[in-house]
């Protein structure tokens, strides 16, 4: 495990940095080191699905007496629709669960389920907030689930064009080490100051895959924005001095992700394909 996991954050000053749009409300309070897994997002996802199923059951139960006044068979038809909805959502959740933990594509429709995933994220954040779970914790777990799905649904591509997007808040030492990867791997590396510039770079370079390094908030926004167009893997940065200043990244994780797309230069067999 990377030594970065042991870093503890220090007190920080709001005025000594240029905060990104996602951190405008930050008050300088120390951040806790985020240590959550995929299970947090999946647990609240299950909660969202169960609540939606229960809501429909209660709704149809309450309006059935009125439905029968319009057409005698209408309540039966409504219950059949509810049953099918529950069956589909249960089956889809099982697909999501198995795909995430096995990192193999178990979805009936093999493409990345971006639309359903997007709908689920919005509901999960609302539910998690009610239970006092921070947006950053949910975001971190969401990114890990999204990464697993990206790996599982990745299609073989011998001419992979990988774009690595970096935040400008990385330390110079860290940035230099990442730039050195360009001498080893066939990748494009760009530093961007925000989502608008990131989208501009994506349109300009037209990659087949994107590796993003950023805080959870920016990663979630980016995945939701372009995750349905091509493969995206996000790597949360490490913020020993708070957000948007002298951040780090797990270089081992970043290099492993690059190898996932373009392969290991020591291995001429090509990119890693599940």
Protein language model features and the residues they cover:
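Short, acidic/turn-prone active-site loops that include or flank metal/cofactor-
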Residues: 195, 214-218, 236-241
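Short helix-loop-beta junction
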Residues: 178-188
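N-terminal topogenic membrane-targeting module
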Residues: 20, 76-177
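Long terminal accessory regions outside catalytic cores
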Residues: 1-93
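Ser/Thr/Gly-rich flexible loops in soluble cytosolic domains mediating phosphotransfer, phosphorylation
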Residues: 232-270
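A short, well-structured beta->alpha microelement
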Residues: 149, 186-201
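Proline-aspartate-enriched helix->loop->beta-strand connector
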Residues: 206-208
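Short, charged, surface-exposed secondary-structure boundary motifs
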Residues: 201, 220-225, 241-248
